[in-house]
A protein has these predicted regions:
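Vicinal oxygen chelate
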Residues: 1, 53-98
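Amphipathic alpha-helical segments
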Residues: 2-15
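Short secondary-structure junctions
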Residues: 13-18, 74-76
Length: 107
């Protein structure tokens, strides 16, 4: 849990609001992400690498300038524009969750 919270705080700029070994919450721009410890290692093995989340942010370009410095530690897809009107980058977290980070292109 500590590694996950540290990733969201250090890399993506979230602020921890609740933190324990079993359950933690981080917040950024009024959005929260909740983390719960897996029921067992077997459950974790089943979901590892099969989870995706989408986080909408403000000022993606300044966040991207920070995040791209972690290329040597995490799998990252560079900032790009999507056909559905979002500017995004993608990053894998320490638990192999794929995180889509985006902002409406028109902002």
């Amino acid at each position: 849990m500590e590694e996950t919270v540290a990733f969201y705080q250090t890399v993506l700029g979230f602020t921890p609001t609740t933190q324990s070994a079993e359950y933690s919450i981080v917040e950024r721009d009024g959005q929260t992400v909740h983390f719960m410890k897996a029921a067992s290692e077997e459950v974790m093995k089943c979901v590892r690498g099969h989870t995706e989340i989408y986080i909408e942010v403000r000022d993606i370009h300044s966040l991207w300038e920070h995040v791209k410095s972690f290329r040597d530690r995490y799998k990252i897809r560079d900032l790009f524009d999507r056909e559905y009107g979002m500017t995004e980058f993608h990053i894998g977290d320490p638990n192999e969750c794929l995180i889509f980070v985006g902002e409406p292109t028109s902002r």
